[in-house]
């Protein structure tokens, strides 16, 4: 999947209510800057806080990127004025134990632990935890790490049933996330050098 494909890939898990209105305002700005929206939430902490999670199409997000995104979406939010109270704007990367919101997230993080919830019962459960062993266009398969008596060790979860999913922090995940970040930074540096030579 190319960065252009990633840019256009829809999110499986989206917001509702006010959070959806905020996402509708913010997402076009992010896409225009080469970023993807992961999640937006209004939280009641330290007064009202609007939490925006985003990343570049290659999966990276620096502190400088967070500043740029904040500076770009702040004036748009001021004009649209979707919130009638004072709030703090917090822009961040999704982090290592990130929310899984696109099909490509399940492909990218195959082999890692995830916990998820479904909107329907699958094998008498709605909550699952396990290693992603396979992902395709329709869903993903988990190898459970906590099996109840009588349950199959693997469970297939269709993307249409997914209501929430998040990576679980492990040493392997930290190692692979750092490796992916290092590779993305090296590729960006090489691209910058090539652009300067032209």
From Swiss-Prot:
Similarity-based family: Belongs to the RimP family.
Taxonomic path:
Bacteria, Pseudomonadati, Pseudomonadota, Alphaproteobacteria, Hyphomicrobiales
Q: Name one GO cellular component term.
A: cytosol
Keyword Cytoplasm appears in the UniProt entry: yes
Organism listed in the record:
Rhizobium etli (strain CIAT 652)
Q: Which UniProt keywords apply?
A: Cytoplasm, Ribosome biogenesis
SUPFAM superfamilies, sorted: YhbC-like, C-terminal domain, YhbC-like, N-terminal domain
Q: What does this protein do?
A: Required for maturation of 30S ribosomal subunits.
Q: Which GO terms describe its biological process?
A: ribosomal small subunit assembly; translation
Protein name, entry field:
Ribosome maturation factor RimP
Q: Which InterPro entries match?
A: Ribosome_maturation_RimP, RimP_C, RimP_C_sf, RimP_N, RimP_N_sf
Q: Where in the cell is it found?
A: Cytoplasm
């Amino acid at each position: 999947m190319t960065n252009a494909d990633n840019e256009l890939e829809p999110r499986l898990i989206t917001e509702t209510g006010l959070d959806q209105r905020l996402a509708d305002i913010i997402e076009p700005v992010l896409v225009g800057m080469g970023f993807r929206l992961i999640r937006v939430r209004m939280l009641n902490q330290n007064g009202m806080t609007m939490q925006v999670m985003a990343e570049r199409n290659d999966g990276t997000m620096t502190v400088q990127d967070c500043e740029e995104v904040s500076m770009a979406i702040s004036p748009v939010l001021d004009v649209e004025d979707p919130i009638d109270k004072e709030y703090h704007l917090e822009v961040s990367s999704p982090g290592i134990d990130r929310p899984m919101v696109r099909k490509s997230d399940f492909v990218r993080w195959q082999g890692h632990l995830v916990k998820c919830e479904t909107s329907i019962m699958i094998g008498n459960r709605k909550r699952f935890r396990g290693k992603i062993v396979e992902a395709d266009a329709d869903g993903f398969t988990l190898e459970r790490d906590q099996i109840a008596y009588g349950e199959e060790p693997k469970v297939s979860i269709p993307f249409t049933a997914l209501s929430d999913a998040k990576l679980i922090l492990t040493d392997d995940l930290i190692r692979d996330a750092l490796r992916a970040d290092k590779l993305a930074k090296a590729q960006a540096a090489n691209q910058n050098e090539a652009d300067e030579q032209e």
